[in-house]
Amino acid sequence: MRTISAIGIFAIAVAPAFAQAPTTAQARDMAATCANCHGTNGVSAGGTDSLAGVPKAETARKMREYKAGNRPSTVMQQLAKGFTDEQIDAMAAWFAAQPAK
């Protein structure tokens, strides 16, 4: 019984190491949650920054700063906490690939 429990605990502990990065379609779907403030496909109509065409590293850095509480915000800190670093990278790459307008 201990062996089975140990195997189960080990499997749970290492599972994140085998998780795959989000696909482009998954990144697009996650990025859609940003549309209310940042516009469709990251093209803002005003009031917030556009994300379309922004370099991946810049968007990912800002999201991680929000997530860590190191960047002031009323909403973004809570939203960013809901994403893993891999998801943040995938969304940042997706926004970077969108044409800026």
What are the residue ranges of the model-derived segments?
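Cleavable N-terminal signal peptides
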Residues: 6-7, 17
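Residue-level hotspots at or immediately adjacent to binding/recognition sites across diverse folds
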Residues: 20, 40, 79, 94-96
